[in-house]
């Protein structure tokens, strides 16, 4: 089947609605929507839930941008895109909970297509989801990765191990020599064997995110915590900021190509702290995190 951008867009709009409804059902607070237009073509819906019962901030973005020509920065790496009109669309979200025992989560699914008369379209899907705990619970990590593995299985035995490794490699802070979290799935440039297969996989990832995340939220959201845990959460959120501003390709591409800054930086935690040469106490739960987030096979 030939790529159907309209069908993908409808799925993404519905996915944004569904995820917002599911997060509101857990939290009790409503999302506030900010619709925006892009001067050179397209727009989006940014939705933010702030200071809820469970989530300190949750941002769920839909964007659909299009134009007559790709920016030079993009065609330099992909000369086959030169002279083509393009459409890029996706849903991207980050959830920062109040409770330090509830991990931060991130998910993204996206579609890109570039076309010109008389030529086959160039298209691909990308996306994934990843989890960033502050305190490690093995049962949570196993559930997260089991959900990821199970949604991948109908698409091939090798899909989960391949996209898990890609996720581990991608969400890595080189300047800290550590993982951002315990990973999950990451894929990009997916366009084989055909559109229907790739679209079905992207849908499975989009729908699988809340299956993976919400049971963990329910399990941890009522755990008692004090200032020590909160301070550690804010300190570890600093790693999230460092990754997004230094290493994340999507953030950098968006800022360099004149994307909507408020939407791009919606992934940032609302509060964060840095501390010079912080060393957790030996044997403490805080010290255990550095071992917990090291790459391993969870399932």
Swiss-Prot record:
Location of the protein in the cell: Cytoplasm
GO molecular function list: coproporphyrinogen oxidase activity; metal ion binding; protein homodimerization activity
Pathway per the UniProt entry: Porphyrin-containing compound metabolism; protoporphyrin-IX biosynthesis; protoporphyrinogen-IX from coproporphyrinogen-III (O2 route): step 1/1
GO CC terms: cytoplasm
Listed name of the protein: Oxygen-dependent coproporphyrinogen-III oxidase
Presence of keyword Oxidoreductase: yes
Gene Ontology annotations of biological process type: protoporphyrinogen IX biosynthetic process
EC number assigned by the record: 1.3.3.3
UniProt KW keywords: Cytoplasm, Heme biosynthesis, Metal-binding, Oxidoreductase, Porphyrin biosynthesis
Annotated function: Involved in the heme biosynthesis. Catalyzes the aerobic oxidative decarboxylation of propionate groups of rings A and B of coproporphyrinogen-III to yield the vinyl groups in protoporphyrinogen-IX.
Record SUPFAM superfamilies: Coproporphyrinogen III oxidase
Origin organism lineage: Bacteria, Pseudomonadati, Pseudomonadota, Gammaproteobacteria, Enterobacterales
Binding locations of a divalent metal cation: 96, 106, 145, 175
Catalytic activity, as annotated: coproporphyrinogen III + O2 + 2 H(+) = protoporphyrinogen IX + 2 CO2 + 2 H2O
Gene from which the chain derives: hemF
Residues binding substrate, per UniProt: 92, 108-110, 258-260
Cofactor: a divalent metal cation
Active site residues per record: 106
Complexes and interactors: Homodimer.
Family in the record: Belongs to the aerobic coproporphyrinogen-III oxidase family.
Ubl conjugation is among the record's keywords: no
